[in-house]
């Protein structure tokens, strides 16, 4: 599903290099210190950065230079980037057509997705009239409505309080299972990773320092847990 073979990106002439394989349907957390290269890894997959060298494969095809809109991925950021003057339905609809000219089938698809994330009764509201958790659900729905097999999340829930964050993690787990999505999620929260992703990548200094069970990091069983301040 996802393969990075010696994918290298230069940051101020310093190479960040990634080797990685993720099977279809896997849920993988990406942890590590600030500035280690976690977001860079996602941006290379999403197409916002172009590798200097190496091969990037997504869903069985090479995508080193494919524009973001033509890659089999959707990406959700910490900032939900909703348009304040558009309704919830219109913000979701942008995932289907930038001009919001939707077919009847697409309107049905939008409503089905909204129902799946619990927004079916909020479609006519503006973002300012809904909660922070509901705004993130709207942004997630906009990703899901595109029906891409790979979902990339860059600290999507860090601005939410613990209860809302746990609620969103549970929702995401259900959505991934229902849609059989392949998920990679950057986070600074090991608890979120433990609840959602059996596998974790620990990125340090532009390299994948650890690739293994999330539980081994949380328990301190792996020596790599020391990077996260966990006693081994």
Curated annotation (Swiss-Prot):
ATP binds at residues 32-39. One of its GO terms (cellular component) is plasma membrane. It comes from Sodalis glossinidius (strain morsitans). It is an enzyme of class 7 (translocase). GO terms for molecular function: ABC-type thiamine transporter activity; ATP binding; ATP hydrolysis activity. This is Thiamine import ATP-binding protein ThiQ. Part of the ABC transporter complex ThiBPQ involved in thiamine import. Responsible for energy coupling to the transport system. It catalyses: thiamine(out) + ATP + H2O = thiamine(in) + ADP + phosphate + H(+). It is a peripheral membrane protein. InterPro entries: AAA+_ATPase, ABC_SmlMolc_Importer, ABC_transporter-like_ATP-bd, P-loop_NTPase, Thiamine_ABC_ThiQ. Its main location: membrane. Keywords: ATP-binding, Cell inner membrane, Cell membrane, Membrane, Nucleotide-binding, Translocase, Transport. It comes from the Bacteria. SUPFAM superfamilies: P-loop containing nucleoside triphosphate hydrolases. Pfam families: ABC_tran. The complex is composed of two ATP-binding proteins (ThiQ), two transmembrane proteins (ThiP) and a solute-binding protein (ThiB). It is found in: Cell inner membrane. The keyword Ribosomal protein does not apply. PROSITE patterns: ABC_TRANSPORTER_2 (PS50893), THIQ (PS51288). The gene is thiQ. Belongs to the ABC transporter superfamily. Thiamine importer (TC 3.A.1.19.1) family. SMART domains: AAA. Its EC number is 7.6.2.15. Residues 2-230 form the ABC transporter domain. The keyword Cell membrane applies.
């Amino acid at each position: 599903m996802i393969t990075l073979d010696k994918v290298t990106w230069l940051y101020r002439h310093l190479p960040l290099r990634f080797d990685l394989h993720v099977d279809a349907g896997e849920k993988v957390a990406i942890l590590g210190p600030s500035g280690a290269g976690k977001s860079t890894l996602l941006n290379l997959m999403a197409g916002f950065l172009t590798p200097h060298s190496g091969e990037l494969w997504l869903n069985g095809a090479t995508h080193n230079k494919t524009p973001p809109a033509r890659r089999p991925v959707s990406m959700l950021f910490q900032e939900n980037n909703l348009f304040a003057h558009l309704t919830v339905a219109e913000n979701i609809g942008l995932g289907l057509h930038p001009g919001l000219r939707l077919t009847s089938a697409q309107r049905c698809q939008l409503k089905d997705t909204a129902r799946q994330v619990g927004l079916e009764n909020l479609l006519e509201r503006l973002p300012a009239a809904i909660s922070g958790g509901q705004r993130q659900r709207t942004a997630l729905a906009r990703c899901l409505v595109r029906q891409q097999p790979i979902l990339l999340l860059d600290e999507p829930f860090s601005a939410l309080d613990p209860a809302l964050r746990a609620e969103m993690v549970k929702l995401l787990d259900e959505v991934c299972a229902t849609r059989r999505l392949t998920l990679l999620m950057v986070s600074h929260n090991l608890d979120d990773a433990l609840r959602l992703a059996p596998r974790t990548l620990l990125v340090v200094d532009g390299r994948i320092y650890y690739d293994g069970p999330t539980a081994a990091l949380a328990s301190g069983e792996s020596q790599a847990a020391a990077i996260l301040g966990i006693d081994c």
